[in-house]
A protein has these predicted regions:
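Structured helix-beta-strand junction loops
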Residues: 25-26, 46-47, 124, 194
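Conserved beta-strand scaffold positions in the cores of enzyme catalytic domains, especially
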Residues: 52, 82-84
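A short helix-to-beta-strand connector/capping loop
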Residues: 77-81
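Mixed-charge interfacial surface used for oligomerization/domain docking
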Residues: 1-6, 59-62, 66-71, 83, ...
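Active-site cofactor/cluster-binding pocket
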Residues: 35-70, 74-75
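N-terminal glycine-rich anion-binding loop in soluble enzyme alpha/beta folds
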Residues: 1-39
Length: 215
């Protein structure tokens, strides 16, 4: 992720607070680049069974890069098994898929059984999101400055979902954190949630997550 003249790598050492502060402090649009095939190849090294979950291919080239790396790796390591999953999503749903993969592997299932089970599971998962700021959408030209200003002044939160094809779609606009929590809860019920694991990913918004969790 490039913000002005600084480059941030999204790994375990990333200082997210510093990155966000830098992002909000500059008027320039931020830019991002997906992992290269070489990045994936280094991660594959030494493994016999590999499961890889990428952010939705509609937002990033990560999935295509991973598929290319898979094909390259299998040329030299034909006995390795690799399954690349396009999450068709982002954020918490990616975490949900990774957690489920770990559960399936811990059950001692074969590689093929894990592939079948995670494919079935993914059909039942869903991403809902609440966006409190639209600064980067304005900077990147995806939203007009006028709309961005109105959203900020009226404290409007965007409530949306990842579609079945992996695009991010707007569902509702809610004014203020309380109404956005209610809107998110309504969308969860509308989506047919009837129990099961929920992953909530947030940045500096623990209060809203707790309010939703308490519903």
């Amino acid at each position: 992720i490039q913000v002005a003249d600084q480059v941030f790598v999204d790994d375990s050492s990333l200082d997210i607070d510093h990155m966000m502060e830098t992002m909000y402090a500059t008027a320039e649009a931020s830019k991002s680049a997906c992992p290269s095939p070489d990045d994936y190849l280094r991660a594959f090294e030494g493994a016999k069974n590999i499961f890889l979950v990428t952010i939705t291919g509609t937002l990033s080239g990560s999935h295509n890069s991973a598929q290319l790396a898979k094909n390259i790796y299998l040329e030299d390591h034909p006995d390795t098994k690799i399954h690349v999953i396009d999450s068709l999503s982002a954020g918490g749903e990616v975490d949900l898929l990774v957690e489920k993969l770990n559960d399936l592997i811990d059950q001692g299932l074969s590689f093929e059984e894990v592939v079948e089970a995670i494919t079935t599971y993914q059909e039942k998962t869903k991403l809902l999101f609440v966006l409190a700021k639209v600064d980067n959408l304005v900077k990147n030209g995806r939203l007009s400055k006028l709309i961005g200003t109105v959203v900020g002044l009226l404290n409007i939160r965007m409530v949306g979902e990842a579609s079945k094809t992996g695009t991010l779609e707007l569902l509702q606009k809610a004014r203020g954190p309380k109404k956005s929590v209610q809107a998110a809860y309504d969308e969860i019920i509308k989506a047919g949630y009837a129990g099961g694991r929920i992953v909530m990913a947030q940045r500096n918004n623990e209060k809203c997550c707790q309010q939703l969790s308490d519903r």
